[in-house]
Amino acid sequence: WLCFWLSQMGAKVVGYSLEAPTNPNHIELLKLDIISIIGDIRDLDKLNQVFSEYKPDIVFHLAAQPLVRLSYENPIETYETNVMGTLKVFEACRANNVKAIVNITSDKAYENKEWIWGYRENDPMGGYDPYSSSKGCADLLATSYRNSYFNINEYKKTHNTLLATCRAGNVIGGGDWAKDRLITDIMISVSQGKKVSIRNPKATRPWEHVLEPLSGYLHIGQKLLEEKVEFAEAWNFGPSDEGSIT
């Protein structure tokens, strides 16, 4: 959806990711007018090669191992991808003088207090399961780079990069056929004439359509490219309280 939106606005889009993990997938259906490169974010040499060739002005970093249950089954890959992969994306940005980085993590990066209030951007990072913990680590990594290498007080003096982190959660929308997604599991079960299996029927979580947080990511990206240093920090993106809980 982000690639589609950017290309519709006339941006030259270079995508870097693994092969589409699900079938069907909207990447093939949309026939996007983008440059698509198959690669792993843990491969720093290839990242540097791609960045050097295409010289991006802005990087939206969304690549991740995004599944909680899979993180229990394969914690090493989860941490390698979500933490070390993020580190290598930042290093490629640093080596190639990228102007703006929009780093996408998750609302699961926060330490879960089990309280009724929403989380604020300055609440502590945490993470009970390997996935959530890896996202908290990635967020701390972004904070470190923002302080160490992309410090706004040194902007235009020792570096030319602004880094913002965006946190959203429970994003739904067309094209998401990944495992362990509630809406996806319901659609698959109904289409196959099977009973719907609900893992945590008492759980309540806020939902938002994919275009909602994406509009926020694009807004932050625009502000960074406009050299608005006050936007180089962490941002939450979530739905309103009314009508957003299931």
Regions found by a protein language model. Name each.
Residues 1-168, 215:
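N-terminal Rossmann-like NAD(P)+-binding domain of SDR-like oxidoreductases, especially those catalyzing
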Residues 5, 245-246:
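PAPS/PAP-binding and catalytic site of the sulfotransferase fold
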Residues 19, 238-240:
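Residue-level recognition of strand-loop junctions within catalytic nucleotide-signaling folds
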Residues 99, 229-232:
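Short secondary-structure junction motifs
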Residues 113-118, 122, 130, 139-228, ...:
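NAD(P)-dependent short-chain dehydrogenase/reductase
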